[in-house]
């Protein structure tokens, strides 16, 4: 088994790269998706978030109001640390269970947005960083996710710098390119990962 850490700044196009890797046969463990699951209505995770931040972070249907919580934590590093302290241990536990269920020769790709920030690179056999220019990230966040420029810049500023991410990368996937070019690059990376999985 080859354990791959996949990361990249918000709006860099990490989801597209992970989707292409899954098409090739990777087992994907998506930390963002798991992070949503562990704070779904009725979970201990959501109860802990409400205990820390108050009932104002709940939507009318009892689910987590993500934009509301985001506006609180992304403007305050201490509050962000509190949220991460609740969610990250739950995500780790679920990720471990999914990895243990994968085949011995699998390429297991952990899609981890805050891999750099949390110093998680040593946990993986290989780190793949999806990279895009800050202007590209900003454009995608405003155009595709409907964020205001201020919100988008705050999210970007709360993450590691482009240089910090590239520093921990074993492989960099440049995503300032057209989709076809990205596909070709991901195919090259996949071939490298498969070779790695069979020599582990």
Swiss-Prot record:
Q: Which residues form a coiled coil?
A: none
Q: Which UniProt keywords apply?
A: ATP-binding, Coenzyme A biosynthesis, Cytoplasm, Kinase, Nucleotide-binding, Transferase
Q: In which pathway does it act?
A: Cofactor biosynthesis; coenzyme A biosynthesis; CoA from (R)-pantothenate: step 5/5
Q: Which InterPro entries match?
A: Depp_CoAkinase (IPR001977), P-loop_NTPase (IPR027417)
Query: Could you tell me what this protein does?
Result: Catalyzes the phosphorylation of the 3'-hydroxyl group of dephosphocoenzyme A to form coenzyme A.
Q: Which NCBIfam families match?
A: dephospho-CoA kinase (TIGR00152), PRK03333.1 (NF002879)
Q: What is this protein called?
A: Dephospho-CoA kinase
Q: Which organism is it from?
A: Streptomyces coelicolor (strain ATCC BAA-471 / A3(2) / M145)
Q: Which gene encodes it?
A: coaE
């Amino acid at each position: 088994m080859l354990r791959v850490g996949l990361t990249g700044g918000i709006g860099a196009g990490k989801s597209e790269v992970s989707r292409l890797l899954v098409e090739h046969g990777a087992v994907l463990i998506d930390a963002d998706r798991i992070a949503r699951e562990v704070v779904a209505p009725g979970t201990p995770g959501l109860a802990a978030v409400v205990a820390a931040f108050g009932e104002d972070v709940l939507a009318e249907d009892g689910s987590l109001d993500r934009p509301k919580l985001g506006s609180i934590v992304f403007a305050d590093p201490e509050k962000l640390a509190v949220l991460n302290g609740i969610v990250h241990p739950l995500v780790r536990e679920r990720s471990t269970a999914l990895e243990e269920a994968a085949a011995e020769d699998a390429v297991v790709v952990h899609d981890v947005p805050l891999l750099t920030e949390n110093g998680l690179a040593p946990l993986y056999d290989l780190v793949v960083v999806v990279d895009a220019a800050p202007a590209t990230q900003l454009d995608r966040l405003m155009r595709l996710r409907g964020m205001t420029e201020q919100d988008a810049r705050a999210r970007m500023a709360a993450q590691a710098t482009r240089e910090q991410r590239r520093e921990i990368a074993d492989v960099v996937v440049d995503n300032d390119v057209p989709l076809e070019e990205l596909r070709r690059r991901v195919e090259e990376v996949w071939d490298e990962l498969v070779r790695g999985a069979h020599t582990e």
